[in-house]
Amino acid sequence: MSLLDYFRSSKSKTASVAKERLQILVAHERYYRNKPSYLPQLQEELMQVIRKYVQVDQDAISVKFEQDDNQETLELNIILPDSQNTRNTQQDAVRNSF
């Protein structure tokens, strides 16, 4: 009888793990389904505009969209380099343009 109990307990463990994974996948899918399709393009265009003035990496900008019952929020975070690096980059750009 203990041998049968061994197989039964692993089955419920496997079912529990599968259920947990499925819940994660469903939550992930719901998050991306409610996200507007224009966000990647918006992020790229914002990067182009910002790069006109300051040299930043692709990872320096993040766009986050949240949707509640009555409102939608678009959060934009940009990590700008320190002002000394910005000045040097701008001066180099001016020197290289002549």
From Swiss-Prot:
Claim: Calcium is one of the keywords in the record: no
Keyword Nucleotide-binding: no
Function recorded in the entry: Prevents the cell division inhibition by proteins MinC and MinD at internal division sites while permitting inhibition at polar sites. This ensures cell division at the proper site by restricting the formation of a division septum at the midpoint of the long axis of the cell.
One GO process term, biological-process aspect: cell division
Pfam family, one: MinE
Family the entry assigns: Belongs to the MinE family.
HAMAP family hit by this protein: MinE
Entry superkingdom: Bacteria
Gene: minE
The name this protein goes by in its record: Cell division topological specificity factor
Keywords from the named record: Cell cycle, Cell division
InterPro entries named among the record's database cross-references: MinE, MinE_sf
